[in-house]
Amino acid sequence: FLFSKKKNMHLAISGNIGSGKTTLTKKLSEHYKWIANYEDVENNPYLNDFYKDMQRWSFNLQVYFLNSRFRQVIDIKNSNKTHIQDRTIYEDAHIFAPNLHTMGLMSSRDFNNYQEIFNLMDEFVKGPDLLIYLRASVSTLVEQIQKRGREYENSIRLDYLTRLNERYEAWISEYSKGKLLIIDVDDINFSENEEDLGNIIEKIDAEINGLF
């Protein structure tokens, strides 16, 4: 490990709903002794309502996530330790909010308002040192979502996941905020298979050691 060059790195894991971000964040934080910053799903006051009525609650939910993620990024920036973040502020702004707008689930004035808030925040935000993208097919996502059995996710539609996946691929293809590591998760099981996790860790080591 050549961590001595930079003690306070910022790594982030991106990917669609059910791609395994939270699981990998936990495993990597345990392995490297990094601080994990999770997505705020437990305390989020809008999530249940959003999945019942997306149109009504889309703006509220997205602003909540944006605020929560911005706070995380500021905390990471001011920290002298290495952090690994479960999803980035860019996914909120470039994938989830535009998708809701395109699907007619967020009005244009709300979307424009949202974009203005993000653009302001973006001036204070730097991309992570390394972004790890978990690429998964829709069938893998559905399988994972069903396996973890979060009640509010039962109503997620296939076309919603498909559109998100398309937006993820478009975003990743143009990503330029820092180093990028893409991991195809369809044929691996890092949550239960130590060898699969070990392979991911090797790739991350190579990226980190080449960073500085």
What do these predicted regions represent?
Residues 21:
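Conserved lysine of the Walker
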Residues 30-68:
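Conserved substrate/cofactor phosphate-moiety recognition/catalytic segment
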Residues 142-212:
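NTP-dependent small-molecule kinase module
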Residues 95-169:
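A glycine- and Lys/Arg-enriched "phosphate-lid" helix/loop adjacent to the NTP-binding pocket
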Residues 24-25:
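Post-Walker A alpha-helix
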Residues 13:
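Hydrophobic anchor at the beta1->P-loop junction of P-loop NTPases
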Residues 57, 61-126:
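Glycine-rich phosphate-binding loop used to anchor ATP phosphates in small-molecule kinases
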